Curated annotation (Swiss-Prot):
The keyword Aminoacyl-tRNA synthetase does not apply. The gene is RCF1. GO terms for biological process: mitochondrial respirasome assembly. The chain crosses the membrane at residues 33-50, 69-88. InterPro entries: Hypoxia_induced_domain, RCF1. This is Respiratory supercomplex factor 1, mitochondrial.
């Protein structure tokens, strides 16, 4: 069976979605607060380097370029250290999210199948009514 989801009128229901992008973003910032600090330090150093370049202050410009490199190093260290520290937790979270996704896909599939069964039953009922009407019309034609 392919990984593509089956179409259904239940796709718009919110119970099929667990964590929004904003919730994930805030959770990740809370888990690893040093990464945004590193981004901010790097951005600040770049901004100060730009201001120094415009002012013609080459000494401050070189200091800020070094600060930018330190900011990058700090950010990279925070990413690697956070990856090591939260590695096991992330694996467990991925397994949990995969289980939720499988459950959600199964619910969608079951809902879709129920919907198809209802449509099939309605179609069969309509065909039976149509056949009964045709039979009654033929009977009336024979008598008439």
């Amino acid at each position: 069976m392919s990984n593509t989801s089956l179409p259904s009128s239940f796709d718009s229901h919110p119970e099929f979605f667990q964590e929004t992008k904003w919730q994930k973003f805030t959770r990740r910032i809370k888990e690893e607060p040093l990464i945004p600090i590193g981004y901010a330090a790097t951005s600040y150093a770049l901004w100060r380097a730009y201001k120094s370049m415009k002012a013609g202050d080459s000494i401050e410009l070189n200091r800020m370029f070094r600060a930018r490199i330190y900011g990058h190093a700090f950010t990279l260290f925070a990413i690697v250290a956070g990856g090591i520290y939260y590695g096991n937790e992330r694996r467990q979270r991925k397994e949990f999210e995969k289980a939720l996704q499988e459950k959600s896909n199964q619910q969608k599939r079951d809902s879709w199948l129920r919907e198809l069964e209802i449509r099939d039953k309605e179609d069969k009922d309509w065909r039976q009514r149509h056949a009964a009407i045709e039979a009654a019309a033929k009977e009336a034609e024979k008598k008439g």
